[in-house]
Amino acid sequence: MPRCVFLWLLTGLFGLGVSSAAENDLIDPADLSAAVPEELSETLIIATPHFGALGTNEFAANKSTEMTNSAIGRAPMEIKVANPVLYYANRVKAIELARNQKWQEAKPLLQTLTTEFKDDGDTWFALGLTYLGLEQWQEAIEALENALALGTRLFGMPGGGANPNDMMIRLAEAYGQMNDEERAIYWINQALNARWDDRPKLAGTSFYQQGKNPNFKAFETSEAFQQAAGSYLPIELSRDESWRYDLHYLAGEIERLHVHPYHAISVEAFKQKVNDISRRIPELSDKQIVFAFMQLLGTLGNGHNFIVPAFGEKGSFNQLPMQFYWFSDGLFVVTASEPYRQWIGHKVEQVGDMSTLKALELIKTVNPRDNEMQQRWLAPYYIGLPTVLEGLGIVDKADAVSLTLSDSRGARHLISPEIKPMSFAGFPKLPGLSTGESPLYLRNNNENYWFKKLPKQLLYVQFNDVADKESQSLKQFSEQIQQLIIEGEVADMVLDLRHNSGGDGSLNAPMVATTVLFKALRPKGKLFVLIGRNTFSAAHNLAMSITELTDAVLVGEPSGSRPNAISEAGWFNLPYSRQTGVISSQFHQYGAPEDHRIWIAPHVPVSLSSEQYFKGEDPVMTAIIGISSK
């Protein structure tokens, strides 16, 4: 397998040398076919990799219509199902056995199912996972190749996602277990060409999963594997060359991962920005280089593009010891660490010598977004990062940030808070009150989901993260709510998504079903869905699904995304600095093809002022109780 295919892409795109050692391994794109083992060349029709020179129409293409297989040329096979009733019963049983990792019991059923009916990608996928569980690697490969050719949407299975690029990684892992490095790397590269979105998992640098992938242990130190994994760093690079290597890698991952990288910036302008950053690297500090990378991502023009500059080995940021929120009447301090808690509740009038509104406007260049509600949500987060403030000219020096605050009487106070190393546990949510009892919507907004029965049979459900809890899956939680509805304990229902910025959208279906069940059993009952600036990504998709299937009443602010939007978080980890971030890898259409709304607008618009927040009031729930009682 030729090495440094990816390095060829990076250096070929931008004309920026990395090192002579790397250049010795560059290959011509015409030779790419040689990288495919002959016996594998016809197993899959893959979308054409985006290799070439910047400035071609190919690079500006929207990748959302690309497919990893072909529906043309694969004729349906003969159906050999003698007893359809028994077939269906066995299909249900076999998939459930596979879900519970009862591989030995699932295996004969799935073998029979795929013999009787060969055109169901779901059963081939379940059989492939079963063979993987039984360490029958060659059999797993054959089953997964069939699943890949047919396609599947069988989710909730252990050890493998149903997306085509995830299946390609499973194929690579099977070859890895067989110590076949060439075929393993071939399938890794196929997955990368199909925009596989968690490349750091290969190198053990994933944001969510620590440790290297054990399936590739036999050759994890080889240069070819490290190139595919994105962890290779040429030796004897200078500091500036190493940062340029990261820049090339980031630009290449934008080109590989982003579903439509040039919808907001031209190819030529993007190339110029990369060249400008490369030229300036010798004069920039490590933190300033990471800021320049943030600005590069900021040109992409949609919300799932950012760096989290908290976990890198080089260039990680500091932050101010306080959190801000943009209320209807301005930017305020909502929480702070000691000794700055006395400033909670104060309005931010100036950042350095610049007015807060002007500073917030400048933040837009590092805050790629789906709409301007996302600016309301995330601009306060960026205000808390001194390197961003310095890079945008809001302050002169990142280590000397001053804030002008005003209290409720209008008195002004100039403070210079001491910066601290950056920590990150997710983008900020509006916190509970620092003093006194918090209102219902702020009490447990770091818990994934919970509910409370309110007077007059009003059920309040707060859904904050689209992710399973260890103690109770989202499906189990939804079933618990469904039982309350069935038992007649709910007259009206509230689903609060104001703190929910997303997660795993494949988990949403049970909650959608819960809202549909409520409307079916309580046709005169009111279903309220609360939305706002934080309602984003998988949570936004949930809100769209509910509004398509029910007559839910939307209450709050406009949402933080669009019905049809470039979305999905494709993770990257830079080889030198180890900075982590995401790039938008998919287009999600939850509205009609011609749904051009810039957000989901509430039926009952309600804003939140600083006075209401600090008094512990929730004007959204006040409005709902008023409507519910009618």
Role assignments for model-derived ranges:
Residues A21, I45, N57, N69-A82, ...:
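Flexible, low-complexity junctional segments that flank or bridge functional domains
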Residues R99-N100, G133, Q177:
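Register position in tetratricopeptide repeats
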Residues H346, E487-V494, R498-S629:
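Conserved acidic, small-residue-rich alpha-beta core segments centered on
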